[in-house]
From Swiss-Prot:
Membrane topology, as annotated: Multi-pass membrane protein
Low complexity bias locations: 190-205
Modified residues (Phosphoserine): 75, 79
Swiss-Prot/TrEMBL keywords: Apoptosis, Coiled coil, Endoplasmic reticulum, Membrane, Mitochondrion, Phosphoprotein, Transmembrane, Transmembrane helix
Protein name: GRAM domain-containing protein 4
Entries under InterPro entries matching the protein: GRAM (IPR004182), GRAMDC4 (IPR037847), GRAMDC4_PH-GRAM (IPR037845), PH-like_dom_sf (IPR011993)
Function: Plays a role as a mediator of E2F1-induced apoptosis in the absence of p53/TP53. Inhibits TLR9 response to nucelic acids and regulates TLR9-mediated innate immune response.
Length: 633
């Protein structure tokens, strides 16, 4: 009984529709039990579980088609049950007799019901595990899709695309409005034309035909004109300029060095051209300069100067074309010196980076300083900062203007060309070999050297103010001095140092006194690189300038042996000096070279270095020019 019932239950469970299989009464079953065969029990599945399975199935296959999924052979085993669950199960209601047997615990169907419930619970547990797995898969897919969406938004930069889309929409709206305005204007122009009433049927037909032909001809002409010249007319349409903000690169030592090298390579053709011109003027190669001078003067005399320069430009471009094609053409008056290119290091230490930045900054500072000096001199020349210099240019321009008005251009061009050739090839050569002659008679050189820069103007203004203050203080001191003192005693007291009178300390004559600019001197330190002892190598003190001497008073020793007196006539070279090259800036020192010293004497740590240099240099030029004029006379 139990075995037959269990096999019948399994057959019912394996049926495709899920309905119960009611077997006909068998005689052997009746003989075994002594009564009619029992009816099978069908457990009704829960509707909540089926609804949950349907929802999970929709979640799992959301966004995908059935054809995109794996085949049944590669899909999990639970797919068959899921597909079977989509068909609603219709089970017949059990009869009252079956319900009585279910309620009877001692009945023969108890074991069958227990086995069926156990199998059903097992299948429900498997389905719950499967549901749990589907939920985990869905959550993981959701997480991965969110990550991909976030990365996709970051890569495509949706904000910028949205802004660009808004701009395009706005532009489209504006174009539509313009098109509507144009169409409206055309529609208003057409009915505005006067229409004459027809006098007759033939006249009306002829008039309409003529109007149609004229309108067709006008439209064709307009279409042809728009096709030919519409593109050019559109080019002249004014459009608002878009302000684009350029992103600035951060400061980088490697980038700064590379930019300086690029600037040097870019300026190399210009510097080579200037060097070749200077070599022609200096007659570096006698044959080349002689040929160039002869060709130039003949071209100017016959009026071929402009064609000659144009031919030289064409020749230069032709040579550049051949060089670009691979030809090795090297021609230069001055031999080129190949500079060793240091290989770029990948890893630099902190000290190397710092030194690299300092070197590049120093080169950039010097380059910018030279460019600023040139531009400031040109600006001061045209702004009448130095009237006597600008007046010469003013007179020269008036003379050139009057000459161009009264003389023919051929004669003016001939005069200018001949003067330029003689000046470039002959006069400049003589002036470069004779500096004193150039300082007296080379007018362009004198004008350019005398033009001041803005820092020099500020220094002169500051020196004038300080001189006025010192003059006022000296007048007040003299007026407050005792009446018994003579003028010489007052002057000697005023020009005395901390250790005594000025001329006694430096063993000079009484008329040697500091200039008005440096009456109190400049605090500095004397660096004598000829000495080896540290006490003699660096001395602290005060520097004075007289009419004929440069005097240094040491502040440590009372002996006058440690003081330094240099005659201005003995100075061979004087220039600004930078004691520590590591520090930024142009330095705070002055280097003075004399025949008695192997290495220049350096006066360092001077706060007013530029003022002291200008004073010493101007007094030196004054003394040397006076001596030269005295020797010539």
């Amino acid at each position: 009984m139990g075995i037959a019932s269990h096999s019948a239950f399994r057959e019912r469970e394996s049926s495709p529709t899920g309905a119960s299989l009611d077997a006909s009464p068998r005689p052997w079953d009746k003989g075994l039990s002594g009564r009619e065969p029992p009816r099978h029990v069908q457990v009704r599945p829960r509707s909540a579980v089926l609804n949950m399975l349907r929802r999970l199935d929709r979640i799992r296959f959301r966004g995908h088609k059935r054809e995109d999924l794996l085949d049944l052979a590669e899909s999990p085993n639970a797919s068959d049950t899921e597909c079977g669950d989509e068909i609603p199960l219709k089970t017949p209601r059990p009869s009252p007799r079956d319900s009585e047997e279910l309620r009877d615990p001692a009945g023969p169907g108890t074991l069958i019901m227990a086995a069926g419930v156990q199998d059903f619970n097992r299948t429900e547990f498997d389905r719950l595990n499967e549901i749990k797995g589907h939920l985990e898969i869905a959550l993981l897919e959701k997480h991965f899709l969110q990550e991909e969406l976030r990365k996709l938004r970051e890569e495509t930069n949706s904000e910028m695309l949205r802004q660009e889309l808004d701009r395009e929409r706005q532009r489209r709206i504006e174009l539509e409005q313009k098109m509507q305005e144009v169409l409206k204007a055309r529609s208003e122009e057409q009915p505005a034309q006067p229409q004459q009433p027809p006098k007759g049927q033939s006249q009306a037909s002829n008039g309409t035909g003529t109007e149609r032909r004229s309108q067709g001809l006008a439209s064709r002409v307009q279409k042809w004109f728009y096709e030919r010249f519409g593109e050019y007319i559109e080019d002249f349409r004014f459009q608002p300029e878009e302000n684009t903000v350029e992103t600035e690169e951060p400061l980088s030592a490697r980038r700064l060095t590379e930019n300086m090298r690029r600037l040097k390579r870019g300026a190399k053709p210009v510097t080579n051209f200037v060097k070749n011109l200077s070599a022609l003027s200096d007659w570096y190669s006698i044959y080349t300069s002689a040929i160039a001078f002869t060709v130039y003067m003949n071209a100017v005399w016959h009026g071929w100067a402009i064609p000659m320069f144009l031919f030289l430009a064409i020749l230069r471009l032709s040579l550049n074309y051949l060089i670009a094609r691979g030809w090795r053409i090297q021609w230069s008056i001055v031999p080129e010196v190949s500079e060793a290119v240091e290989p770029a290091k990948e890893d630099l230490t902190v000290s190397e980076k710092f030194q690299l930045v300092l070197d590049v900054a120093q080169k950039a500072q010097n380059l910018f300083g030279k460019m600023a000096d040139i531009l400031e001199k040109i600006k001061n020349l045209f702004m009448w900062v130095q009237p006597e210099t600008t007046q010469k240019l003013y007179v020269a321009l008036w003379a050139a203007f009057l000459a161009s008005c009264f003389f023919p251009y051929r004669l003016v061009g001939l005069a200018v060309g001949l003067y330029a050739g003689i000046k470039f090839f002959l006069i400049d050569f003589i002036f470069k070999r004779c500096p004193r002659l150039r300082a007296k008679y080379d007018t362009p050189y004198i004008i350019w050297r005398s033009l001041p820069t803005d820092p020099q103007l500020k220094e002169r203004a500051g020196a004038t103010v300080s001189r006025r203050l010192q003059t006022a203080s000296s007048r007040s001191y003299v007026s407050s001095a005792p009446a018994g003192l003579s003028k010489d005693e007052d002057a000697g007291r005023f020009h005395s140092t901390k250790k005594g009178n000025f001329h006694e300390i430096f063993n000079l004559t009484e008329n040697e006194r500091p200039l008005a600019v440096c009456e109190n001197g400049w605090r500095c330190c004397l660096i004598n690189r000829d000495r080896k002892m540290p006490t003699d190598y660096i001395r602290n003190g005060v520097l004075y300038v007289t009419e004929n001497y440069l005097c240094f008073e040491s502040s440590k020793s009372g002996s006058s042996k440690r003081n330094k007196v240099i005659k201005l006539m003995d100075i061979t070279d004087i220039q600004k000096y930078k004691v520590l090259s590591v520090l930024p800036g142009s330095g705070m020192g002055i280097a003075v070279s004399t025949p008695s010293t192997q290495k220049p004497l350096v006066f360092g740590a001077m706060v007013h270095r530029d003022e002291a240099f200008e004073t010493i240099f101007s007094q030196y030029v004054k003394i040397t020019s006076a001596a030269a004029s005295g020797g010539d006379s």
